[in-house]
Amino acid sequence: MKSLALALLVGGAIASGPQQQVLREPVDDPQAAETPLQKISDIFGHLSEQAGNVWEDVMDKFPDTLMDAITQTPPPKKHNRRPDSQWDHIVRGSDVQAVWVEGDAGEKHRKVGGRLDTYDLRVKAVDPSNLGIDTVKQYSGYLDDNENDKHLFYWFFESRNDPKNDPVVLWLNGGPGCSSLTGLFLELGPSSITKQLKVKYNEFSWNSNASVIFLDQPVNVGYSYSSSSVSNTQAAGKDVYALLTLFFEQFPEYSQQDFHIAGESYAGHYIPVFASEIMSHSHRNINLKSILVGNGLTDPLSQYPHYRPMACGEGGYPAVLSSSSCQAMDNALPRCLAMIQACYNTESRWSCVPASIYCNNALIGPYQRSGMNPYDVRSKCEGGNLCYTQLDDISKYLNQDAVMESLGAEVSSYESCNMDINRNFLFQGDWMQPYMRVVPTLLTQMPVLIYAGDADFICNWLGNKAWTEALEYPGHDEFAAAEMKNLTSLNHEDMKVIGQVKSAGNFTFMRLFGGGHMVPMDQPEASLEFFNRWLGGEWSAKSP
C-alpha cells in the first residue's frame, strides 16, 4: 500500500513552498556558505556539468524542508532483542550454507545458493487463541542479518483449506516503507481491526486456499528494525531471498508446494527484482511459480503520461481536476518524460532524483492539492497523508503489549509507514529506475500477472495497461494485439462482470472494476476469486 507517499508530500511542498534562493549571502564560515547544490554533491559524489544544470533548474523550486530531508539521518528504532530461549526455532544461515549435496552427474554443490552465513531465522509458534486472528497454524519471527544488524519481521498464516497441498504466497505492501501488516488487516488477511480494536473475521481472506507470509520489509518498516538502512530495491532482494530460504529450510513441508510472490504499489519495483534474485540461484529451495503485482509502479516512463488522463475524466470516472490543471499537466509532461528517459539511460541518482522531484510535483501535486483521495478517485482524503483512518486503528492494535508479546515483536512501537525509508529510496534514485527491464527474462521462466483496481489514481490502470503493452520482449506483438475481454465471476449465477482481462503467453493484465489502490479492501470477493483462479492456472499460472 501507499506508493508515492513521500512523493505526494514532495509535490505539495514544492508547489506550495516559496521560491528559494540557490545562492545565499556570503558568510565567514565556508561550510555554511555551501550552496544546496554543493551540499548534495557532497552527499552523492561527483556531479557532472549536465547533471548540475538539471539540479540547478529543479532546485529553483526546491524548499529548505527537502534539503533537510536529504541530509537528516533518522535515529535507530528503539528495540529490545529477546533471548534465544524465547524462540521455538532458530535456523542458522551458516549451517544451511555449509550443506553440500551431490548432483545427478556426481558433481558436488551447495544445497542452496547465495550467501547465507550472516543470516539467522528466529521462529515463534503463535498461539491462535491468544489473538483470535485465525484458527490456523501461525508462525512469526525475525530474519536477522547479524553482520549488518538488520532484523526483518514476518507473520505466516497457514491455508484454511488444504495446507499440505495449497500454494504458499509472500505478500508485500509498498511505500516504499509501509508495513505488510497493513495488507494483512486492511486488505487480504484473515481478520480486520475495528475501531474498538477488536478483530473481525474476513471470509474473503487470501489464506482461504493458500498459506500466506506477510513480511515487513525493508528494515525499519513495521515491526522490523535496524541500526543501518536499505535504500534500494536490489539490496532489499538479498534479504528476502535469505528469509525464504531459511524459512523453507525450517519448514520443508511448505517448500514442495507452488510458491508465488504478490504485492501492490511500490511492490511493482520489489517483486520483479525479488523474483529475479530468487531465479538467479540455480540451487534453491524456493519453488517460485508466478508473480502478481497489483496497482504497481514498474515502468514510470510508460505510466506517468497517464496521470493527466486518469485525473481528468478519461479513466472511467468523472474528472477530478479543472481544465486548466489538466492543461498544466499536459504542458509539463514532455519535460518529465525527458528527465525519466535520462534516468533510464544512466540509472544514476543524479538523473533519477531530479526526475522524481519534477515529475511528482508536476503530475501528482495537482491531484494532491485537490483534496481527493489519490488511492481512490471516488472519495475525498479522510485525513492524514495516507487518507485512511483505519490505519490508526491497526497501529493502535499492533502497539498493544499483549499483541507484541504474542508475536515476539522486539520494537518499542509500530507505525504503518516509515517516511524515512520512503525518503531514502527517493533520494537514492530508486523511484524512477527501469525495473521493468527484468520482466522479459521472468516471462521466460514463469507467468506474470499485472492487475489494477480501476479507481486508483496513484498507480492507475491506464498506466499499468500501457507499460504491459509497451514492454519489449519476444511476445510483445501478440500481447499488445490481444483483446481486453470481460472477466466474469464464476461465483454468481447472473454472470456478473467484475473486470476485464487480456492474456498472451505468460503475460496477463487485469482491470478490476470498482477497486481502488487496494483491490482486496474495495472488492474483497472479486479479489479472492481472481486470486484463486490465477493460482489455479486459468490464465497462465502454470510454469512452462
Swiss-Prot record:
GO terms for molecular function: serine-type carboxypeptidase activity. Coiled coil: none annotated. Keywords: Carboxypeptidase, Disulfide bond, Glycoprotein, Hydrolase, Protease, Signal, Vacuole, Zymogen. It is found in: Vacuole. It catalyses: Release of a C-terminal amino acid with broad specificity. It holds the Pfam family Carbpep_Y_N. InterPro entries: AB_hydrolase_fold, Peptidase_S10, Propeptide_carboxypepY, Ser_caboxypep_ser_AS. Disulfide bonds join C178-C417, C312-C326, C336-C359, C343-C352, C381-C387. It comes from the Eukaryota. Its EC number is 3.4.16.5. One of its GO terms (cellular component) is fungal-type vacuole. Residues 1-17 form the signal peptide. This is Carboxypeptidase Y homolog A.
